[in-house]
């Protein structure tokens, strides 16, 4: 994820070379991986510059005020400085750095009639000849550009919001009324429909998959069915316990062959396994289940092997590479569900793991999650905490009902 935004306030209209000087400071900060927003470098022709600057003023986590003689006469710099000083009082975490350049001093700043009420001279100021030469001190004041680690739930909400926005022509106001939600206040620089989509997405995640049928009904018919289906899949993934799901991604990293994962439940092949995988690899979509076709017969290893190789051939028609070569090189995380544990003993499972070292095999254990190590399954991870079967049943039923409604659109 990108680092927090840094806003650069300046006035460069009257002094020759001032724009170039300000641009050099911006480049120095950007070169240290800061996300710097500067009007004449970032705003393009046709953009609503006023809305864009307001958005930066609201969103920035740090701001640099370049206070030159021109800036102290600028109504717009005064407006930006006022907004940022109020933000600083409300949010002490905001980094606000006055940089005094081209002869401006703390004393002259404190006596500048327009800026006196802001008391900017009481902040830790940087004094420099020009903007470019202030770069080392500004970088020290900003500190390292720490990239944000966005929680999975926030990423999921953003994804759902993007899907809601994709449903063109939908009036989210009606959805808010139906769900008895308060509409969000206006936020400068942001489309109102986008704000409503973000709030609705967070509400969906809070309610979870159990609310899917109600939400699909409220969204209405005739709306992008594929987007609604994707929303249901995300809600299903976040029903799964994160710790249990992570056993799948961790098992894939084992060497020299991926470990198998044992999961209890009653709906593994049709619902639960996909929810586990989506949560395990979130937000990546680079994973696939390989279905095991038909009955296992007497030679289980041979049957599974043939099913895997046929799936690869169907996926890559006309490929010059053999299925085994594709399996060895693909970046896609591949999984195979073994829906009946009695189909395989530890020797057969080990044979499959050796034959397909990059595939994660998932064992369905039924209602309980027994300790399989006593049965000789030495390289099997138990997906704990175990599933609550009642919760699984509710989630699967809600998911199934929601999809039935989507298919009826």
What are these regions (language model features)?
Residues 216-262, 271, 275:
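Walker A/P-loop-proximal flanking segment of P-loop NTPase domains
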Residues 256-287, 307-308:
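P-loop NTPase Walker A phosphate-binding motif
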Residues 1-31, 100-189, 193, 198, ...:
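C-terminal interaction surface of TIR/SEFIR-family domains
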Residues 269-272, 287-313, 317:
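Conserved phosphate-binding/catalytic loops and adjacent sensor/switch elements of nucleotide-binding enzymes
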């Amino acid at each position: 994820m990108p680092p927090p935004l840094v806003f650069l306030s300046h006035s460069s209209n009257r002094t020759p070379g001032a724009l170039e000087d300000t641009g050099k400071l911006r480049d120095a900060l950007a070169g240290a991986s800061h996300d710097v927003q500067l009007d004449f470098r970032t705003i393009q022709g046709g953009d609503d510059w006023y809305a864009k600057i307001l958005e930066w003023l609201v969103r920035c986590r740090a701001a640099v005020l370049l206070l030159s003689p021109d800036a102290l006469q600028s109504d717009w710099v005064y407006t930006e400085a006022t907004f940022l000083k109020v933000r600083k009082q409300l949010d002490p975490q905001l980094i606000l750095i006055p940089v005094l350049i081209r002869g401006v001093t703390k004393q002259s700043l404190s006596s500048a009639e327009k800026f006196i009420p802001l008391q900017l001279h009481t902040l830790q100021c940087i004094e420099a000849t020009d903007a470019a030469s202030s770069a080392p001190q500004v970088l020290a004041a900003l500190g390292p550009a720490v990239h944000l680690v966005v929680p999975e739930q926030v990423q999921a909400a953003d994804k759902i919001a993007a899907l809601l926005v994709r449903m063109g022509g939908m009036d989210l106001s009606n959805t808010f009324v139906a769900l008895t939600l308060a509409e969000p206040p206006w936020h400068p620089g942001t489309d109102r429909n986008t704000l409503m989509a973000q709030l609705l997405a967070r509400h969906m995640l809070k309610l979870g998959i159990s609310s899917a049928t109600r939400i699909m009904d409220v969204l209405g018919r005739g709306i992008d069915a594929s987007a609604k289906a994707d929303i249901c899949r995300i809600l299903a993934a976040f029903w799964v316990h994160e710790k249990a799901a992570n056993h799948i991604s961790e098992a894939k990293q084992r060497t020299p062959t991926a470990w198998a994962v044992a999961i209890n439940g009653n709906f593994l092949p049709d619902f639960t396994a996909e929810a586990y995988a989506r949560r395990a690899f979130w937000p990546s979509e680079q994973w696939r289940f390989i279905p095991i076709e038909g009955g296992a017969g007497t030679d289980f290893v041979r049957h599974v092997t043939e099913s895997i190789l046929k799936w690869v051939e169907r996926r890559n028609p006309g490929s010059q590479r053999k299925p085994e070569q594709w399996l060895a090189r693909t970046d896609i995380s591949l999984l195979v569900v073994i829906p009946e544990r009695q189909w395989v003993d530890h020797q057969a499972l080990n044979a499959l793991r050796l034959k397909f070292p990059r595939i994660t095999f998932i064992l369905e254990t039924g209602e309980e999650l027994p300790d399989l190590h006593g049965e000789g399954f030495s390289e099997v991870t138990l997906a704990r905490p175990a599933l609550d079967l009642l919760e699984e049943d509710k989630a699967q039923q809600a998911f199934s009902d929601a999809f039935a409604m989507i298919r009826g659109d």
